[in-house]
Structure formats: C-alpha cells, structure tokens
C-alpha cells in the first residue's frame, strides 16, 4: 500500500465528513468506541464483531495520546478492514517495526492529525529541528517523524530528521 494511497484515503474521509478529529470520524462511521481502564500496557485495539466495528482505547492515557490511538485504530479500520474481519488487532503485540499494518496505521494517524500546510508553515526554515517543530504543533516526536516521512515521500521537500519507529506509542 503506497503512502499516496493512505493520504488520498484520508482526503476522502475529511471531505466526506468535514472533520479531521478521529473521534468525530469514528462516530460518523458508526464505529463503537469504548474506554477501558484495565488494559494495562495495551494502548488500544480494533475489532469487527457481528457486522460492527469496535475500537477500545486505554482510558488511563492522556487525552492527546487517546487521540493518536483513536486515529491509529481508525487507520486499521479504513486500511485493514479485511484483516480485522479475520482477527482483532491489539496494540501491544502489533507495534512492531517490521509490521506493514502498524506502519500504515501510524502513517494514517500522522497524516490525519497533522496537516501538510501546518507542518510546512511551522518548519519555516532549514534551522528548524524536530523538537521545535513538535513544540509548535503540539505533536509527539514519533508522530511527527511519520508525518515528515509521508511528506518527504510525496515530494513535498521536507527533510527527514530521523528514522520512523512504528513502536513510538509503545514506549509512552
């Protein structure tokens, strides 16, 4: 699956529902979202059961991290619907750098939550570093790395600052 395909899927969702907020998108798509306070190290999960998509999010996470997890799980629903119909995806075992589904869901979350225009404006000049870029946009470094990689691979001229790590949510 190409980065451009992921980006185009997000564009279609945003145009159709008029929002980039993952919780609003999940609601508009009739996905049941539940917060669980006993998930321990699991950040979230998505599953398909009885012809209905469900997303579970760790209720102990800070609100901004819950938004990232919601966007990530939405990515699984949009990009990996068939895989979800076969088996639920839990985000303790799936934050694996070698997993293409996790990489794609992280890319989806980054492109959904961070607009190209905002990143370009915040980047400003060649002296911008990852820390100041994240601070100005209120973004986690791992998420920002995925966004920068997406923009770079789509030819938007943003330099890559570090290698993307699909496990960035697992460490928090």
Please report, for each region that a protein language model flagged, where it lies by residue:
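Active-site hotspot residues in diverse enzymes, especially metal/ion-binding acidic/histidine motifs
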Residues: 1-172
């Amino acid at each position: 699956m190409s980065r451009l395909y992921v980006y185009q899927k997000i564009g279609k969702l945003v145009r159709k529902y008029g929002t980039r907020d993952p919780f609003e998108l999940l609601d508009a798509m009739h996905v049941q979202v539940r917060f669980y306070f006993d998930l321990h190290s699991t950040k979230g999960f998505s599953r398909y059961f009885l012809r209905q998509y469900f997303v579970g999010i760790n209720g102990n996470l800070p609100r901004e991290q819950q938004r990232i997890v919601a966007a990530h799980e939405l990515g699984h629903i949009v990009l990996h619907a068939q895989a979800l119909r076969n088996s639920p995806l839990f985000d303790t075992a799936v934050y694996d750098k070698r997993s293409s589904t996790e990489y794609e869901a992280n890319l989806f979350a980054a492109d959904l939550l961070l607009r190209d225009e905002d990143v370009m404006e915040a980047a400003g000049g060649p002296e911008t570093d990852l820390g100041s870029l994240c601070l100005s946009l209120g973004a986690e470094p791992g998420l920002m790395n995925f966004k920068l990689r997406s923009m770079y691979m789509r030819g938007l001229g943003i330099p890559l600052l570090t290698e993307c790590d699909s496990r960035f949510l697992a460490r928090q």
